[in-house]
From Swiss-Prot:
A motif (WSXWS motif) lies at residues 210-214. Keywords: Disulfide bond, Glycoprotein, Membrane, Metal-binding, Receptor, Repeat, Signal, Transmembrane, Transmembrane helix, Zinc. The keyword Transmembrane applies. Zn(2+) binds at D206, H207. It is found in: Membrane. This is Prolactin receptor. It holds the Pfam family EpoR_lig-bind. Residues 254-608 are cytoplasmic. Interacts with SMARCA1. Interacts with NEK3 and VAV2 and this interaction is prolactin-dependent. SUPFAM superfamilies: Fibronectin type III (SSF49265). Disulfide bonds join C31-C41, C70-C81. This is a receptor for the anterior pituitary hormone prolactin. Residues 318-327 have a biased composition (Basic and acidic residues).
Length: 608
């Protein structure tokens, strides 16, 4: 027994003296899976003890008692073990150990617990691309692009990859690392022009390890950034040169026309009769006169110069035809009644200057001027005013007593109540005819006058003065001397009268219409049957159309009263105007039946 123990100690001492020992303890370096389907484990062997040593990898799965040896020691290289899909399971924990054995003994590494899900280390990104670009502000940058690893399934979402890039200039020692997240492209700014840069990329899954750095690529940043396609600049330059040549040629040939088109001349005044000197001097009144514009009429404060309207009784039974017609209408023709409420231009009455303007200028008048019947009685009618012939002007005044009056212009205090019709502007239009009408007298009385009413009798009085003819070339011819013993009446009353003028007080002065044979009726002895006329209308030639009244009453009394009127004393020129103005409305009225009529010849003499 003691001899056997001594033998063993002798052998051991001899082995130690020769340098042989059991193998050292191996160490598992790492286990990695590129795609969660396969994985590989690497280890570092210990000392071999001077003897040949065998290494083996054994594993077991958690929850299982069986131990398995590595299926493939060659695929991944020496000191490694490759697990194919057949031997790889996810959501399982592997317990892995490495054993070393030689003639002197054996040794075992520490166990390593591996979960395939957390040991993924993908391949580096592929297809790395570098490009230098320029922004609109001429600032350059480096554009880096790459693709995910080929083995990993990124499109289906089996992996979620994150990326990093690193770059440095060729002369630098340290790398500049940029994390890009899940993007596969990145822009690097603030690069130094004229230097060469080195770029690399890598990736890692959401749970795992960073891949190794990929292939290294380099690029040089140019000093002056220029476009690669220089043909674009060449084309632009050629087109610009052609356009410039065309413009120079056009200006050389048609320089004046082009300058006129670009800078047109200032047009001058094209108004006929327009005086530029008046415009430059700034005299607006002379300029308006040159253009034919009327200046503003002067204002007048004399209210008594305006005549409100003319009122003449209208015969509702009979009507004469216009002056150009020589026949009277038939019995079936009815007179046209006027609407008493129609507007007659009352605004003309309110104008202070309309009367003078319209009485001075000849104007075109309406074909007819109808005047409605006014039957309102004055408050203070004048009566029994004897005629006062003026020897200087040979102007008679007639008077007839009546209970009704027709509105005529009076002084401001003697105006009677008037109907709100008939503006004086319309009356002045009738009075604005040329002066050559002074040569006209009473036209030939129409033979086919409507029959007078038998009830009117044959004793109507004509309180009218005969008028002698005026020369056509003189307007201001005096009237013949008047007879002082009584009024002179016509053998046959006149049918037409013509407006002579309108005096400053707005009173109409009438003349008898001249006959066709240029002869006037001479005054003669009144016949047994007399007729008085009333205004029926106004023709185109401003002639009043008169119609005899068939309802004249009490003509005998009127004739007697007219004959008994004594002549008044001689008046001077200023008193004559006032007397003719105030006494016209009462002295020239005749009451025939229940209507009033005016004697045109009386006004003709009084306002001449």
């Amino acid at each position: 027994m003691s001899s056997a123990l001594a033998y063993m100690l002798l052998v051991l001492s001899i082995s130690l003296l020769n340098g042989q020992s059991p193998p050292g303890k191996p160490e598992i370096h790492k286990c990695r899976s590129p795609d969660k389907e396969t994985f590989t484990c690497w280890w570092n062997p210990g000392s071999d003890g001077g003897l040949p040593t065998n290494y083996s990898l054994t594993y077991s799965k958690e929850g299982e008692k069986n131990t398995y040896e590595c299926p493939d020691y060659k695929t991944s290289g020496p000191n490694s073990c490759f697990f194919s899909k057949q031997y790889t399971s996810i959501w399982k924990i592997y317990i892995i150990t490495v054993n070393a054995t030689n003639e002197m003994g054996s040794s075992t590494s520490d166990p390593l617990y591996v979960d395939v899900t957390y040991i993924v280390e993908p391949e580096p990104p592929r297809n790395l691309t570098l490009e230098v670009k320029q922004l609109k502000d001429k600032k350059t940058y480096l554009w880096v692009k790459w693709l995910p690893p080929t083995i990993t399934d990124v499109k289906t979402g089996w992996f979620t990859m994150e990326y990093e890039i690193r770059l440095k200039s060729e002369e630098a020692d340290e790398w500049e690392i940029h994390f890009t997240g899940h993007q596969t492209q990145f822009k690097v700014f603030d690069l130094y022009p004229g230097q060469k840069y080195l770029v690399q990329t890598r990736c890692k899954p959401d749970h795992g390890y960073w891949s190794r750095w990929g292939q290294e690529k380099s690029i040089e940043i140019p000093n002056d950034f220029t476009l690669k396609d220089t043909t674009v600049w060449i084309i632009v330059a050629v087109l610009s040169a052609v356009i410039c040549l065309i413009m120079v040629w056009a200006v050389a040939l048609k320089g004046y026309s082009m300058m006129t088109c670009i800078f047109p001349p200032v047009p001058g005044p094209k108004i006929k009769g327009f005086d530029t000197h008046l415009l430059e001097k700034g005299k607006s009144e002379e300029l308006l006169s040159a253009l034919g514009c009327q200046d503003f009429p002067p204002t007048s404060d004399c209210e008594d110069l305006l005549v409100e309207f003319l009122e003449v009784d209208d015969n509702e039974d009979e009507r004469l035809m216009p002056s150009h017609s020589k026949e009277y209408p038939g019995q079936g023709v009815k007179p046209t009644h006027l609407d008493p409420d129609s507007d007659s231009g009352h605004g003309s009455y309110d104008s202070h200057s309309l009367l003078s303007e319209k009485c001075e200028e000849p104007q075109a008048y309406p074909p007819a001027f109808h005047i409605p019947e006014i039957t309102e009685k004055p408050e203070n009618p004048e009566a029994n005013i004897p005629p006062t012939p003026n020897p200087q002007n040979n102007t008679p005044n007639c008077h007839t007593d009546t209970s009704k009056s027709t509105t005529w212009p009076l002084p401001p205090g003697q105006h009677t109540r008037r109907s709100p019709y008939h503006s004086i502007a319309d009356v002045c239009k009738l009075a604005g005819s040329p002066g050559d009408t002074l040569d006209s007298f009473l036209d030939k009385a129409e033979e086919n006058v409507l029959k007078l009413s038998e009830d009117a009798g044959e004793e109507e009085v004509a309180v009218q003065e005969g008028a002698k003819s005026f020369p056509s070339d003189k307007q201001n011819t005096s009237w013949p001397p008047l007879q002082e013993k009584g009024p002179i009446v016509y053998a046959k009353p006149p049918d037409y009268v013509e407006i002579h003028k309108v005096n400053k007080d707005g009173v109409l002065s009438l003349l008898p219409k001249q006959r066709e044979n240029h002869q006037t009726e001479n005054p003669g002895v009144p016949e047994t049957s007399k007729e008085y006329a009333k205004v029926s209308g106004v023709t185109d030639n401003n002639i009043l159309v008169l119609v005899p009244d068939s309802r004249a009453q009490n003509t005998a009394l009127l004739e007697e009263s007219a004959k008994k009127v004594p002549p008044s004393l001689e008046q001077n020129q200023s008193e004559k105007d006032l007397a003719s103005f105030t006494a016209t409305s009462s002295n020239c009225r005749l009451q025939l039946g229940r209507l009033d009529y005016l004697d045109p010849t009386c006004f003709m003499h009084s306002f001449h």
